[in-house]
Amino acid sequence: NYLKENNLIKNDKNYQKDITYDKNFFDSIDNEEKAYWLGFIMADGYTKLDKNNNPAQMSIEIGKKDIEILNAFKKSIKSNHIIRERSRTTVTGKISEICSITISSQHLTSKLISYGVIPNKTYIGFINEEIFNNNEELIFHYLRGYSDGDGTINKNKGNYVFKLVIKSKSILNTIVNWIKKYCNIDPKITIWEGAYRLSVQNKKDYFIFLEKLYKNANIYLDRKYQNYLSHINCAVPEEKP
């Protein structure tokens, strides 16, 4: 069995028969769904190689409270994969409920790797900009996926803040350049606990950026989108773009 030989399953109870999905889904990044999910996987997913260093598997793992987004991913790729749920103890001893989906596919995984979702990508992942062909709309669908994974949209003491936590310098540079190019905004960069924190917090800039992030959006993490809508509703006219 290919999965067992390459240590991609731990025991028989994890094995699922008659799996169906669109293995060619990521062959080209030419619409909202593909761009969004690529960004989301870059943030909250990972790829693995088999024992022969061939692309073998991709997974997405998130908090159980956001299980809706995994069901949306399954719908996009026409998948019948099981979403698995488990408890995990953090380094501080806190127990968190998580859910995950794993797809074993050399073809699909190799595509993700070519787009920058490389194994152990945390510090060395990159964004293959060529795949977007300078298409601004696709770029912001990708950024929305990435921010739904690793971003926050908050209002604190009257201040609006969009924040991304990024550990790869390459990914940071690409996203900063996009925000400067398409929004004419210079995001603030700080370093905290070994990671870069990119933030947009000037009120006018905040709404300019988020308006682009959610423009023509059909896929998004609803709780973050609702935060944005509540901020729009509370903002006074001069704060809006």
Feature map (PLM): residue ranges:
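Internal intein/HINT superfamily modules and their associated LAGLIDADG
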Residues: 1-241
